[in-house]
Amino acid sequence: MNTATQAPKDSADSATERFRYGFLKGNPQLTKNGELKHLLSIEGLPKAIVNHILDTADQFVSVTDREVKKVPLLRGKSVFNLFFENSTRTRTTFEIAATRLSADVLNLNINASSTSKGESLLDTINNLSAMHADMFVVRHASSGAPYLIAQHCAPHVHVINAGDGRHAHPTQGLLDMYTIRHYKKDFTKLRVAIVGDILHSRVARSDIHALTTLGVPEVRAIGPRTLLPGGLEQMGVRVFHNLDEGLKDVDVIIMLRLQNERMSGALLPSAQEYFKSWGLTPERLALAAPEAIVMHPGPMNRGVEIDSQVADGPQSVILNQVTFGIAVRMAVMGIVAGNHD
């Protein structure tokens, strides 16, 4: 990638590097009128916009139950899915969401694209824009890549961040908030625990920003010292290095997998040892509030961060997260498509 068009690279050298990313300055995802043109991060989004997305998703949930699962909101629009990292749930649910909005959906085969032959990211985007793309859904290993695209794409094009490095995964954060609201109704009375590899998790970052924006009074980060970033306390997050203590009386548990592909060294012992200390078992779940729900962004590693009895148990809402994710992504795409500078 040309240095003039290069997104910031992730580094394990600093747990608080995200606070120094230049692309966090200002709010390029909003129009001059404060409407959502791109969805790049939950950080900095007004509470009213977050709630508007969740309320709009309510309207799309019922589409799933219809005989004809389509609405004409994006008819005639072209949505390009640009996944520079592997994905199953996110790519598929974005494709389903766009199709149900009646858009024309194109999935770029990255391995066969010109980027694999040395073409810069922005040259790829400019060529796709020349094909009259209306929306880019982008997943990229480099933090800030969607910001770079949003800053340089044609004025009529909208960009949705489907996950960039360790920085953000805003639609996952939003669907997590939708799931919590569906089951718990009132954010202002909740204790929410995020457990596992928070250091490398873009989902954790998006969830923390969303939870604090929506007024959750107590957010807990639970994990080994080697997998927790610095700066959590400054964000109002309570940090626990003991799972049993951290789970006491919580209303929502969000489990995270180990992001082995983002680890630069041996930060942990074996998977079996990790499960003994940090795996969510029925016994540990019993420490939470009686009506606590269990969530996971996927993919799950059973026997590592979560026991199958919990993953498949009555308090698990993991599959419902996937279902709700379609409606939330429909809402995001529909909202941004209607807003222009």
Swiss-Prot record:
Keywords: Pyrimidine biosynthesis, Transferase
PROSITE patterns: CARBAMOYLTRANSFERASE
Pathway(s) where this gene product acts: Pyrimidine metabolism; UMP biosynthesis via de novo pathway; (S)-dihydroorotate from bicarbonate: step 2/3
Catalytic activity: carbamoyl phosphate + L-aspartate = N-carbamoyl-L-aspartate + phosphate + H(+)
EC class (word): transferase
GO cellular component, one term: cytosol
Alphabetized SUPFAM superfamilies for the sequence: Aspartate/ornithine carbamoyltransferase
Listed Pfam families: OTCace, OTCace_N
Binding-site residues, L-aspartate: 117, 202, 257
Keyword Transferase: yes
Any one GO MF annotation of this record: amino acid binding
Superkingdom of origin: Bacteria
GO biological process entries: 'de novo' pyrimidine nucleobase biosynthetic process; 'de novo' UMP biosynthetic process; amino acid metabolic process
UniProt-annotated binding residues for carbamoyl phosphate: 89-90, 139, 169, 172, 298-299
Enzyme nomenclature, EC number: 2.1.3.2
Role: Catalyzes the condensation of carbamoyl phosphate and aspartate to form carbamoyl aspartate and inorganic phosphate, the committed step in the de novo pyrimidine nucleotide biosynthesis pathway.
Known partners and oligomeric status: Heterododecamer (2C3:3R2) of six catalytic PyrB chains organized as two trimers (C3), and six regulatory PyrI chains organized as three dimers (R2).
Family affiliation: Belongs to the aspartate/ornithine carbamoyltransferase superfamily. ATCase family.
Protein name: Aspartate carbamoyltransferase catalytic subunit
Species: Paraburkholderia xenovorans (strain LB400)
Chain's gene name: pyrB
